[in-house]
């Protein structure tokens, strides 16, 4: 089993642009169940059940998609929004570029970790560990540029990845680093 098969993607945040300008009041009427309260938040929130995602739509035409577990769901979500807006006679781009901003994933090293020893071994320039503040160790990986949160249980949360393969690279790197110093 490859490392990627053991990694669970929890959330993908992606962005796109659907137009130069959008009338959010008109969209709020067109998208049943949407939330638009401009005095509290400048964007319109719309939640989909399938795929289970949410989009934030802004007057500037920018759209953020969150909650997707894979890239297909991101694309499907954006396509659904485009379709619904076009049906409401709201002009939007046909096939906008979608940019992944962040992928959050979880991995289990299947071994308890001594975070104090790890903090000493991995070098203070890339590690933050203050157990009184937060129970995990923050490990900033240079290449790929991601942040790993390591917990005593052996669970690892990866954040900051833009591509799925970066998560796998980071997991392989941290495993090698920990094996090299005999901590797993």
Curated annotation (Swiss-Prot):
InterPro entries: TBP, TBP_archaea, TBP_CS, TBP_dom_sf. Pfam families: TBP. Belongs to the TBP family. The keyword DNA-binding applies. General factor that plays a role in the activation of archaeal genes transcribed by RNA polymerase. Binds specifically to the TATA box promoter element which lies close to the position of transcription initiation. It comes from the Archaea. This is TATA-box-binding protein. GO terms for biological process: DNA-templated transcription initiation. HAMAP family: TATA_bind_prot_arch. Sequence repeats lie at residues 9-85, 100-178. It comes from Picrophilus torridus (strain ATCC 700027 / DSM 9790 / JCM 10055 / NBRC 100828 / KAW 2/3).
């Amino acid at each position: 089993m490859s490392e990627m098969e053991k990694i669970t993607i929890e959330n993908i945040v992606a962005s796109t642009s659907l137009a130069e300008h959008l009338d959010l009041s008109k969209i709020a009427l067109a998208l049943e169940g949407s939330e638009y309260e401009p005095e509290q938040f400048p964007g319109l929130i719309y939640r989909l059940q399938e795929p289970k995602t949410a989009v934030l739509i802004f007057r500037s035409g920018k759209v953020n998609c969150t909650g997707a577990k894979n890239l297909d769901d991101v694309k499907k979500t954006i396509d659904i929004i485009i379709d619904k807006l076009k049906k409401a006679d709201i002009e939007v781009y046909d096939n906008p570029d979608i940019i992944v901003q962040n992928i959050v994933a979880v991995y289990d090293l299947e071994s308890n970790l001594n975070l104090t020893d790890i903090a000493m071994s991995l070098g203070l320039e890339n590690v933050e560990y203050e157990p009184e503040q937060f129970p995990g160790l923050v490990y900033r990986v240079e290449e790929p540029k991601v942040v790993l949160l390591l917990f005593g249980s052996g669970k690892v949360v990866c954040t900051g990845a833009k591509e799925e393969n970066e998560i796998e690279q980071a997991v392989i790197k941290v495993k090698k680093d920990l094996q090299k110093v005999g901590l797993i």
